[in-house]
Amino acid sequence: MNGIIPLWKERGMTSHDCVFKLRKILHTKKVGHTGTLDPEVEGVLPICIGRATKLAEYVTDEGKVYVAEITLGKSTTTEDATGETVMTKELADISADELQAALTKLTGKITQIPPMFSAVKVNGKKLYEYARAGIEVERPSRQVDIYSLTRLNGEATLNEANPTFQLEISCGKGTYIRTLAVMIGELLGYPAHMSKLERTRSGFFKKEDCLTLAEIDEMMQASDSSFLYPLEKGIESMAKLVIDEEIHAKVLNGGLLPKSLFIEVENEPRAALIFNDKLTAIYKPHPEKNELWKPEKVIELHQA
């Protein structure tokens, strides 16, 4: 079994829980997810099965879309609703224009510091392990891409009686939405936290494409595997090169290929090689031999 499943991860489960349950449902060990979703977050979680696990990093690298509920006037230890209250501040009126000005400032390339309650590693230990022990450590900042921030629930003024708003976030990999909520609050002069989150898109998979674990289980029991998307779906944005049988034979042996073969994709960081409409391998420019390209992954799906 090879392919990608757009799973709808339900609230209360870890991403690893989903992988564990799918291994049982699908009767296969080769199952991998494409980027962790916190347990209290629900949403699109593409799962790679069989040879598709070789593509997990490329699927993870694609953009994401979230719908978040952000609450102003209160910050928490975890930057979301699960944490203890750190600070509160009564809200004066915040107009739609003031909020939009803050959102505009946070669109584009921004720098974030990961929250203490996160899986980022510092000195070989996950940040949440330090946080649970009550230890605050210096966290490395990271640059992330925010493509768009769109308020969803109208233009009502925010105040003490109406402290929350919904926001659609289109962003690149590695963005912490919790931290974004705090940053929006800071620009407005208030403590803030992310009170709810749903991932509505991951890469090329949307909410409406997804199935729950129960639905996949039901289909498997009916011997229906139509929930599997082909591997090619995971590399839709990657440059592609159709190869002939002679090149294909070299690719199967992991051979180096001449740069001249890649003229139409020469400015790309990598290219997917397609034979008989199937993904065969992913190649990239050789780091030392300027006239050659080398295999990054050999997929061999055509032999499955």
Swiss-Prot record:
Which keywords label this protein?
A: Isomerase, tRNA processing
| GO terms for biological process, alphabetical | mRNA pseudouridine synthesis; tRNA pseudouridine synthesis
Which GO molecular function annotations are given, in alphabetical order? RNA binding; tRNA pseudouridine(55) synthase activity
Asked if Isomerase is a keyword of the record, the answer is yes
The enzyme's E.C. designation:
5.4.99.25
Among the Pfam families in the record, one is TruB_C_2
Keyword tRNA processing in the entry? The reply is yes
Name the reaction it catalyses.
Answer: uridine(55) in tRNA = pseudouridine(55) in tRNA
Stored InterPro entries: PsdUridine_synth_cat_dom_sf, PsdUridine_synth_N, tRNA_psdUridine_synth_TruB, TruB_C
SUPFAM superfamilies attached here? Answer: Pseudouridine synthase
Q: Where is the active site?
A: 38
**What biological function has been recorded for the protein in this entry?**
Responsible for synthesis of pseudouridine from uracil-55 in the psi GC loop of transfer RNAs.
Q: Which NCBIfam families would you find in this protein's record?
A: TruB
User: Which PANTHER family does this UniProt record tie to the protein?
Assistant: PSEUDOURIDYLATE SYNTHASE TRUB1, TRNA-PSEUDOURIDINE SYNTHASE
Name the family the entry cites.
Belongs to the pseudouridine synthase TruB family. Type 1 subfamily.
Protein name as it appears in the record: tRNA pseudouridine synthase B
The protein's organism comes out as Listeria monocytogenes serotype 4b (strain F2365)
